[in-house]
Every structure is written in C-alpha cells, then in structure tokens.
Amino acid sequence: MVLIKEFRVVLPCSVQEYQVGQLYSVAEASKNETGGGEGIEVLKNEPYENDGEKGQYTHKIYHLKSKVPAFVRMIAPEGSLVFHEKAWNAYPYCRTIVTNEYMKDDFFIKIETWHKPDLGTLENVHGLDPNTWKTVEIVHIDIADRSQVEPADYKADEDPALFQSVKTKRGPLGPNWKKELANTPDCPKMCAYKLVTIKFKWWGLQSKVENFIQKQEKRIFTNLHRQLFCWIDKWIDLTMEDIRRMEDETQKELETMRKKGSVRGTSAADA
C-alpha cells in the first residue's frame, strides 16, 4: 500500500514566471536548511534528454538527523538518515524521486508536478487510472492563509497577506484573493498540481511515518510558496541563465555551509 495526496497551490503569477521563481526559491531555501553536518549536498545539476523528453536533471543528497522525528531516530542505524533525491525537471512537468539506501525498495517518496495556467480546478491532471484516483486525497494550499502555517515557521516578511510587490504591484493577498484573481483576466494565474506518493514499509510504523511525511510535504510546499511570492521582487527580472549561475554558486556555498557551523532550519520537533 502507498499513501497518495494531491496538493494544489494557486499563485498570482504565470507558469513562465514560476519556473524562475521556484528555482530561485529552492536555492535560497536550501541555504536556510544547511549547516553543522546536516543539510543538502548537490551532486549533479545538468541538462538531460531521454525518450524525447528534455529538461534539467538534479541529484541531491539530504543529510538528516535532527530533521526526522524522535521515534525514527531511536530505531535508525547510524548513517541511515541519508536520502537521495533525483529530479527530472521537464518544465512545466517535473518528477522527483526520494530514496534511501538503507531501506531500499521499502521506502520512496515520489512527487510529480504539473504547472497549469488555471486556478486549481482541473481533475486528475496526472492521468491516474480511475480506481487509483478515487483513493487520492486533494489538499488545497492557500499561501495567504496563516492558519495553514506552523507557528514556528511564521515570518511576517514572508506573509503574502502583508506583502506587496514593488515591481509587479501584486499583493497583499486578502481572504478572497483567489476569487478576485478569477475575476481579473489580465492578472497572471497558475496552479502547481503536486501528486505525492509515499511508501514506507516497516511493520508497526508504516501509517505513522507515511502520514508524518505527507504532513511535512504540505509544510514544505506551504512555506516555499509563501516565500516564492514574497521574494518576487528578487527574482522577477532574472533569466534562466541567471538562475543556472546562481545554482552553481549555491552548490559551492552549500558544501561549505554543511561542513561547518550549527544545524539550521526546520526540525521534525516543530511538526
């Protein structure tokens, strides 16, 4: 058995703008999660072409320990809390697989994302068979809804309900911002449809861990997209060439940061 959820994140930007904004935000957020021997190591970031599909391939290693729940740390052997993330970004479609060498075939996280120019109203964009689709829970993430944010994660300067972009004049996002967006044809809009499939086969822990991971994925998607919108003035003028240069610099920074300093960023204890 696997646990599948589809997270839908609506944003007041275009699919084209989001491509740059998402890559910028992921690079910045990675720095906030790296230090003291933990965090993110980038092994590969290169173009790929496979069966007519073209895009950017990345292979990252997540060195975790304090970032997993205590009940997992207690039973996890030394060195087992290392996760490999491989992503094939053929934008506007992206596929990410997370695996663990210790658990082998008993664990994976698969995230498939379609980015569409709509307000999150499309059904089964990933083309699942009807029986599987019936089991999928749909979760709507509202980036302006503070109640969806963990108290420990809240930052006023990353709150779309307070932020207004100087360059685009977008924001602040009020309680009815999605309805207002639907009634404003000239304002860009899009939705990231993120299908998350989780398998964790460990007797006695399976449902507990699968539910924990889905909760963490929602938390990550919520925080990242709130940041993405509030950082729009930092990335809206960037090109993909600028982003690739930034990613190269970030890769070197992460390597240095991971080897020194203290553990940074979100921990499972906050969840």
UniProtKB/Swiss-Prot annotation:
Domain of life: Eukaryota
Localisation per UniProt entry: Golgi apparatus; Golgi apparatus membrane; Endoplasmic reticulum membrane
Organism: Rattus norvegicus (Rat)
Family: Belongs to the PtdIns transfer protein family. PI transfer class I subfamily.
Alphabetical UniProt keywords: Acetylation, Endoplasmic reticulum, Golgi apparatus, Lipid transport, Lipid-binding, Membrane, Phosphoprotein, Transport
Protein name per Swiss-Prot or TrEMBL: Phosphatidylinositol transfer protein beta isoform
Acetylation recorded as keyword: yes
Catalytic activity: a 1,2-diacyl-sn-glycero-3-phosphocholine(in) = a 1,2-diacyl-sn-glycero-3-phosphocholine(out); a 1,2-diacyl-sn-glycero-3-phospho-(1D-myo-inositol)(in) = a 1,2-diacyl-sn-glycero-3-phospho-(1D-myo-inositol)(out); an N-(acyl)-sphingosylphosphocholine(in) = an N-(acyl)-sphingosylphosphocholine(out)
Gene3D superfamilies per record: 3.30.530.20
GO CC annotations on file: cytoplasm; endoplasmic reticulum membrane; Golgi apparatus; Golgi membrane
UniProt gene name: Pitpnb
Regulation: Phosphatidylinositol transfer activity is inhibited by N-ethylmaleimide.
Chief site of localization: Golgi
Modified residues (Phosphoserine): S262
Task performed by this protein: Catalyzes the transfer of phosphatidylinositol between membranes. Also catalyzes the transfer of phosphatidylcholine and sphingomyelin between membranes. Required for COPI-mediated retrograde transport from the Golgi to the endoplasmic reticulum; phosphatidylinositol and phosphatidylcholine transfer activity is essential for this function.
Matches recorded under InterPro entries: PI_transfer (IPR001666), PI_transfer_N (IPR055261), START-like_dom_sf (IPR023393)
Post-translational modification: Constitutive phosphorylation of Ser-262 has no effect on phospholipid transfer activity but is required for Golgi targeting.
Tissue note: Expressed abundantly in brain, kidney, liver, and lung, but in a lesser amount in testis.
Organism lineage string: Eukaryota, Metazoa, Chordata, Craniata, Vertebrata
Phosphoprotein in keyword set: yes
PANTHER family, alphabetized: PHOSPHATIDYLINOSITOL TRANSFER PROTEIN, PHOSPHATIDYLINOSITOL TRANSFER PROTEIN BETA ISOFORM
GO annotation (BP), single: retrograde vesicle-mediated transport, Golgi to endoplasmic reticulum
Cross-referenced Pfam families: IP_trans
Residue list for modification N6-acetyllysine: K215
Molecular function via GO: phosphatidylcholine binding; phosphatidylcholine transfer activity; phosphatidylcholine transporter activity; phosphatidylinositol binding; phosphatidylinositol transfer activity; sphingomyelin transfer activity
